[in-house]
């Protein structure tokens, strides 16, 4: 995949070359999208809209730390949707990981989550965030146990993941209507990179075959159900709904 690769660390250790080789990235000086190594983290920038700033994954500080400490925890809609109850903490495959926010929420309340991400740039951002998270004295211990990244296409990986999870979580890219500055900023940068998930409808059936209990699909409230398969079961919040579909139980 072609992208502009930039190093602002001031180091001469060849980290950029290692990054490119690991994720199959090719430097393109004229690409409007840039993957930038800064002294703090790896970030994605839209060079023709510098005011949007950089997008990076941070499990330790910022909004994620606030959500972990002061958010709803088990009461969050995504936690309710995957079925967390009492001692039941399902094993989850997040097949459209993105920046890992919902996966992190589930991990922070006790679920083991395997994140799938097919875009190599997004996977590199996630990996960078995980590396810093794993090294953190506060959250590193449980984060290493509960949150992992698999760089693979969901369409192929969903057919051969083992062991099978109890829940598959899907949050395909869908054009956002929200006017919030953060969503607009992130979505503009993100959609410039990955575009809409045109093959997202093809995820529902393999997800239902893989999950032993349920599939949860996050949708904006104005979006049709994934693959036009309606379900009466959903957790509804302001602006979103989490559609719930039956999985395929394990056979003895």
Swiss-Prot record:
Annotated compartments: Cytoplasm
Enzyme Commission designation: 2.1.1.242
Gene Ontology cellular-component terms listed: cytoplasm
Sites where the protein binds S-adenosyl-L-methionine: 101-102, 117-118, 153-154, 171
Pfam families tied to this protein: SAM_MT (PF04445)
Presence of the UniProt keyword Calcium in the record: no
Biological role: Specifically methylates the guanosine in position 1516 of 16S rRNA.
PANTHER family recorded: RIBOSOMAL RNA SMALL SUBUNIT METHYLTRANSFERASE J
Family: Belongs to the methyltransferase superfamily. RsmJ family.
Protein name per the record: Ribosomal RNA small subunit methyltransferase J
Gene: rsmJ
């Amino acid at each position: 995949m072609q992208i502009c690769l930039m190093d602002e660390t001031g180091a001469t250790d060849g980290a950029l070359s290692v990054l490119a080789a690991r994720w199959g990235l090719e430097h393109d000086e004229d690409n409007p999208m840039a993957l930038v190594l800064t002294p703090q983290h790896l970030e994605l920038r839209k060079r023709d809209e510098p005011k949007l700033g950089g997008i990076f994954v941070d499990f330790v500080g910022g909004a994620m730390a606030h959500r972990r400490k002061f958010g709803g925890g088990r009461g969050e809609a995504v936690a309710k949707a995957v079925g967390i109850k009492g001692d039941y903490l399902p094993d989850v495959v997040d097949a459209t990981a993105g920046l890992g926010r919902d996966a992190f929420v589930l991990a922070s309340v006790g679920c083991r989550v395997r994140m799938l991400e097919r875009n190599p740039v997004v996977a590199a951002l996630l990996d960078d965030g995980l590396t810093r998270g794993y090294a953190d004295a506060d959250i590193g211990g449980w984060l290493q146990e509960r949150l992992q990244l698999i760089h693979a296409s969901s369409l192929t990986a969903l057919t051969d993941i083992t062991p099978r999870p109890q829940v598959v979580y899907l949050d395909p890219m869908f054009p956002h209507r929200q006017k919030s500055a953060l969503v607009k900023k992130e979505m503009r940068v993100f959609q410039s990179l990955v575009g809409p998930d045109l093959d997202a409808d093809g995820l529902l059936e393999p997800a239902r075959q893989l999950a032993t209990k349920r599939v949860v699909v996050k949708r904006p409230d104005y979006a049709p159900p994934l693959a036009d398969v309606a379900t009466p079961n959903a957790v509804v919040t302001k602006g979103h709904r989490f559609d719930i579909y039956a999985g395929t139980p394990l056979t003895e």
